[in-house]
């Protein structure tokens, strides 16, 4: 099929990847209201076109935590990303590296830190959950530091897993899930060969390395449910700082008071995020949560936004709403599932081109020029 946008990659991934993996990325929690709102709230914000300004010199690059990014985006941490393409985390990291943006490795990746880090030139970011096993957390931080990871992304909106009903229907969880996955593999032969056979081992690489035994996909949801720690508090940041001296970003902030706490406890950045609508359904979209958070802490801490970004125009919208940078999750997973590393590289090219068009026609030469005045909220008209 012809690929011209991220939505095309979604359709290509739907055809190529078996349902249990496609819907794991595509779905949200409960009735998926927040998942839908993340997208629709961005769509309801129009860009203010401005003309007759010299836009011959345009720059999409930024500097973030001492790193030069070719565009204001980071590939977000995605669990089990290695199930979308053969050794998928390596391919996605190489694509990001080639396009000049950071890749964030998930705690629950298929490929371990030690496999991904040597495959790229620029330092990757590493994402960490608060887990009951503090020994694992300490081990993961030490390994990330030894591998040269530059920034820690500390995810705080998963003290307990969200209820993702779609996963039960698709075969990721629910009754007879193993049999259903095998049958789906038969109807998706390319994926079955490329990932199912050539992409082994299908284990949680970082966890398996620490445990000294294989923690496979069948154990994935159960392991997470058993190990997420509902006692998570701001004091955990102090504990993490004992083992991590580099930049630390708190992911999962939706309230201005939490953003202020992140500043007070010494975080270097926050990610305004509702986990892509995969945790608590019914919460604010990131687009709606972002402006009051920016009003509260802009300039005191770096603000990154994710959830609902489907094209380069959405990146510009998030920047105008107050973000310093953005994270992409589903968009790159669709591209990875559809076409591997080349798909992710092409997706980033598409987003960058869309950004450049939007910046040109809103008369913003640099990322720093993008302000709230570039937007019109259609819901208020």
UniProtKB/Swiss-Prot annotation:
Binding of substrate, residues: 24, 129, 164, 278
Coiled coil, from the record: none
Protein topology in the membrane: Peripheral membrane protein
Keywords: Cell inner membrane, Cell membrane, Flavoprotein, FMN, Membrane, Oxidoreductase
GO molecular function terms listed in the Swiss-Prot or TrEMBL record: FMN binding; L-lactate dehydrogenase activity
GO biological process assignments: aerobic respiration; lactate metabolic process
Cystine pairings recorded for this chain: none
Catalytic activity entry: (S)-lactate + A = pyruvate + AH2
Compartments where found: Cell inner membrane
Superkingdom of the organism of origin: Bacteria
Signal peptide residues on this chain, from the entry's feature table: none
Residues the entry annotates as binding FMN: 106, 127, 155, 251, 306-330
Pfam families tied to this protein: FMN_dh (PF01070)
Active site: 275
A cellular-component GO term for this protein: plasma membrane
Cofactor: FMN
EC nos: 1.1.-.-
Domain annotation FMN hydroxy acid dehydrogenase: ranges: 1-380
Role: Catalyzes the conversion of L-lactate to pyruvate. Is coupled to the respiratory chain.
Family named by the database record: Belongs to the FMN-dependent alpha-hydroxy acid dehydrogenase family.
NCBIfam families in UniProt: L_lactate_LldD, PRK11197.1
HAMAP family associated with the record: L_lact_dehydr (MF_01559)
Record-given protein name: L-lactate dehydrogenase
Organism encoding this protein: Haemophilus influenzae (strain PittEE)
């Amino acid at each position: 099929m012809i690929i011209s946008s991220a939505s095309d990659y979604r359709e290509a991934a739907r055809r190529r990847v078996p349902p249990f993996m496609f819907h794991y990325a595509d779905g949200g929690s409960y009735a998926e209201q927040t998942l839908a709102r993340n997208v629709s709230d961005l769509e309801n914000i129009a860009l203010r076109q401005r003309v007759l300004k010299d836009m011959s010199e345009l720059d999409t690059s930024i500097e973030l935590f001492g790193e030069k990014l070719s565009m204001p985006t980071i590939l977000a941490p995605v669990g089990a990303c290695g199930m979308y393409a053969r050794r998928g985390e390596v391919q996605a990291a190489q694509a990001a590296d080639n396009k000049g943006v950071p890749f964030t490795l998930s705690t629950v990746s298929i490929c371990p830190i030690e496999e991904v880090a040597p495959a790229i030139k620029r330092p990757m970011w590493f994402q960490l959950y608060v887990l009951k096993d503090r020994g694992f957390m300490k081990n993961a931080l030490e390994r990330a530091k030894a591998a040269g990871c530059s920034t820690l992304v500390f995810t705080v909106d998963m003290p307990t897993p969200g209820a993702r009903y779609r996963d039960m229907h698709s075969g990721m969880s629910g009754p007879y899930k193993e049999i259903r996955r095998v049958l789906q593999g038969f109807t998706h032969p390319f994926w079955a060969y490329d990932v199912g056979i050539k992409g082994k081992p299908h284990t949680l690489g970082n966890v398996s390395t620490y445990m000294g035994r294989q923690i496979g996909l069948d154990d994935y949801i159960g392991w997470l449910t058993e190990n997420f720690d509902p006692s998570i508090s701001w004091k955990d940041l102090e504990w993490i700082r004992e083992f991590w001296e580099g930049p630390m970003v708190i992911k999962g902030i939706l309230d201005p008071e939490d953003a202020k706490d992140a500043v007070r406890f010494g975080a270097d950045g926050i990610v305004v995020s509702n986990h892509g609508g995969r945790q608590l359904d019914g919460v604010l979209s990131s687009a709606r949560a972002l402006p009051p958070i920016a009003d509260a802490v802009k300039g005191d801490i770096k603000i990154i936004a994710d959830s609902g970004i489907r094209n380069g125009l959405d990146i510009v919208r998030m920047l105008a709403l107050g973000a310093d940078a953005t994270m992409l999750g589903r968009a790159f997973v669709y591209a990875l599932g559809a076409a591997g590393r080349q798909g992710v590289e092409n997706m980033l090219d598409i987003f960058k081109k869309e950004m450049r068009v939007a910046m040109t026609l809103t008369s913003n030469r640099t990322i720093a020029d993008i302000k709230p005045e570039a937007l019109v909220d259609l819901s208020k008209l």
